[in-house]
Amino acid sequence: MNGSLSPSCAGVPTFTAHPRHDGHYVKALTLLGALLLSTPLFAAQLTLELGAQSHTWQTEALLKHSEVKTITVSNDVSYKRTMTYRAVPVAALLTGIKSDDHLQAVALDGFAAEMPAAPLLNTEGAQAWLAIEDPAKPWPRLSADKPSAGPFYLVWTHPEAANISPEQWPFQVSSIKRLAPVAERFPALLPDPALKADDPVSQGFALFQKNCLACHRLNGAGDAQFGPDLNIPFSPTEYFGADFLKRYIRDPQSLRHWPQAKMPGFSEAVLPAGDLDKLVEYLTHMAGRKVKR
């Protein structure tokens, strides 16, 4: 035996290394520490559910992908500064996907970004990338009490070329799925079918899908598990005046400030005044189309 039992000050036996084996004991601990440091801190995986082309990617395989490269992202939505990533073009991962398909990117915390495939397939202008966190080179934390944006983060280069919204930058992504369009999956979200496509309410519905549905449900419809339902039991248009609601959407902390607030503000660059008006018109319209539960 390499040691002996001795009583601790609390009366609980403790193991003490035998003096003549101290050197071997220290060497063993050193070797174990080196082994642990050389092992990846985590083994993350990304699931792509693309019908017949479904595939699961491991971090290591993505970092060795033939199209992986180092990219620089200016004004990163999550980190609020310029960031550098090892990343693969999202288009290179979407085998079999067509521009008229619909995709959903799901994050570990329940954030579910509904995204048309066309922008994700772009290889020029606004281009989508899957940034991959290398366990040996971990990214910074998003804040002191939050982890990083990894292990997988959907980022964009030149997002201004296609008016990409912050909700189209999902971080901590766990899966990307091909699904039927939102209107088919969740009819409870639909405005009055008598409205024309160019009606402000109909246009507001499109803006709701792009900017709100990743975090919120409406009439109980949607896949997000992040924020409250925006129509049941009440629509925000029923307890906010229109001007205050718009101010809240622009800067939530200007009306309700608390440390754990998670809703981001939507600047004029992301949601122009005319689009904000249409979004509020949609919410007002849907307050009269509540689903009975």
What are these regions (language model features)?
Residues R217-R250:
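Gly/Gly-Pro-rich "capping" loops immediately C-terminal to redox-active cysteine motifs
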